[in-house]
From Swiss-Prot:
The protein's name: Acetylornithine deacetylase
EC code: 3.5.1.16
Functional note: Catalyzes the hydrolysis of the amide bond of N(2)-acetylated L-amino acids. Cleaves the acetyl group from N-acetyl-L-ornithine to form L-ornithine, an intermediate in L-arginine biosynthesis pathway, and a branchpoint in the synthesis of polyamines.
GO molecular function, one term: zinc ion binding
Binding of Zn(2+) 2, residues: D112, E145, H355
Active site location: D82, E144
Residues that bind Zn(2+) 1: H80, D112, E169
Gene: argE
UniProt organism field: Shigella dysenteriae serotype 1 (strain Sd197)
UniProt entry keywords in alphabetical sequence: Amino-acid biosynthesis, Arginine biosynthesis, Cobalt, Cytoplasm, Hydrolase, Metal-binding, Zinc
Alphabetized PROSITE patterns for the sequence: ARGE_DAPE_CPG2_1, ARGE_DAPE_CPG2_2
Taxonomic lineage: Bacteria, Pseudomonadati, Pseudomonadota, Gammaproteobacteria, Enterobacterales
Length: 383
């Protein structure tokens, strides 16, 4: 059956040639069904059982779980099937044609992160899955680049509890064991419009927002003082005021003002805790002006993530790579997979190539990535 599997570079080429863009804008958003079908067929050829899971609340998106072996525990290798949209004017190559040049493989998703599945499939050619002592799972998720709906839904619904997981995001093969989360909110204040010549007849939303911002900045200072995680370059939760808009004319009392902000929490801080801190900070404004201030999510929140530094997964991977685990500031699906089992983020390619025109993966990653995948499968599924 394994001889039906195409060569490594042809698998890679087919993955890149199959569009699977995720976007909040419906006109740009694409189903990942064709890519899931490709992966499902290849893993079936390798003797895996394959389950395709529709993801609710998405535009025809799917997860795929390929599994082999019996019993509890085992290893989960995970990644997302979607890419970001691309700016055609900034690409000098066809994003959907895998192009090799000067030691680099170019194409949309080469690094972030369709290519990881090509590495898994290629490594499995030489693995007799019938002899595994523990199960091996391959998870391909949907919509990581927007809502992370695929990983969220899988984590909420699966009964699987592997011993550990590796998510193959581009980390330049440097293992990552922790990252911050991301919460984004819209603060909206509804005032009362009126002519600027008679301020008493209106409620100026900009003035109320000025008051609210003062309390939010106090929260920012408090977060910096109360929470600390030395391993991060910025070792405290950050709070950013990113966008504000209010009013429509200089001679009108502003009736509405909206502020967009984000918080990047440290691992261990819960979403409920952060929501409570924000609501407490804004309580004086809400109490003084009942019904005029609302807080809404801009995007589904992502908690911080941490794999215990003394876990066997960390020790094994650090020994195999000869490198210590790191912490990073960007977000992945790890917080959701971590609810199932200890998880590391580790994969070929550089995060600096993610979301960039002329995205590429350096060919120097091919051999060590294949070896690493083979080694972790041997360690966690054969021992």
């Amino acid at each position: 059956m394994k001889n039906k599997l195409p060569p490594f570079i042809e698998i890679y080429r087919a993955l890149i040639a199959t569009p699977s863009i995720s976007a909040t804008e419906e006109a740009l958003d694409q189903s990942n069904a064709d890519l899931i079908t490709l992966l499902a067929d290849w893993f079936k050829n390798l003797g895996f059982n394959v389950e395709v899971q529709p993801v609710p609340g998405t535009r025809n998106k799917f997860n795929m779980l390929a599994s082999t072996g019996q019993g509890a525990g085992g290893l989960l290798l995970a990644g997302h099937t979607d890419t970001v949209p691309f700016d055609d004017g900034r690409w000098t190559r066809d994003p959907f044609t895998l192009t090799e040049h000067d030691g680099k493989l170019y194409g949309l998703g080469t690094a972030d992160m369709k290519g990881f599945f090509a590495f898994i499939l290629d490594a499995l050619r030489d693995v007799d899955v019938t002899k595994l002592k523990k199960p091996l799972y391959i998870l391909a998720t949907a919509d990581e680049e927007t809502s992370m709906a695929g990983a969220r839904y899988f984590a909420e619904t699966t009964a699987l509890r592997p011993d550990c997981a590796i998510i193959g995001e581009p980390t330049s093969l440097q293992p990552v064991r922790a990252h911050k989360g991301h919460i984004s909110n819209a603060i909206r204040i509804q005032g009362q419009s009126g002519h600027s010549s008679d301020p008493a007849r209106g409620v100026n939303a900009i003035e109320l927002m000025h008051d609210a911002i003062g309390h939010i900045l106090q929260l920012r200072d408090s977060l910096k003082e109360r929470y600390h995680y030395e391993a991060f370059t910025v070792p405290y939760p950050t709070l950013n005021l990113g966008h504000i808009h209010g009013g429509d004319a200089s001679n009108r009392i502003c009736a509405c003002c909206e502020l967009h902000m984000d918080i990047r929490p440290l691992p261990g801080m819960t979403l409920n805790e952060l929501n409570g801190l924000l609501n407490d900070a804004l309580a004086p404004v809400s109490e003084r002006w009942p019904g005029r201030l609302t807080v809404d999510e801009l995007h589904p929140p992502i908690p911080g993530y941490e794999c215990p530094p003394n876990h066997q997964l960390v020790e094994v991977v650090e020994k195999l790579l000869g490198a210590k685990t790191e912490v990073v500031n960007y977000c992945t699906e790890a917080p959701f997979i971590q609810t199932l089992c200890p998880t590391l983020v580790l994969g070929p390619g550089s995060i600096n190539q993610a979301h960039q025109p002329d995205e590429y993966l350096e060919t120097r990653f091919i051999k060590p990535t294949r070896e690493l995948i083979t080694q972790v499968i041997h360690h966690f599924c054969w021992h």
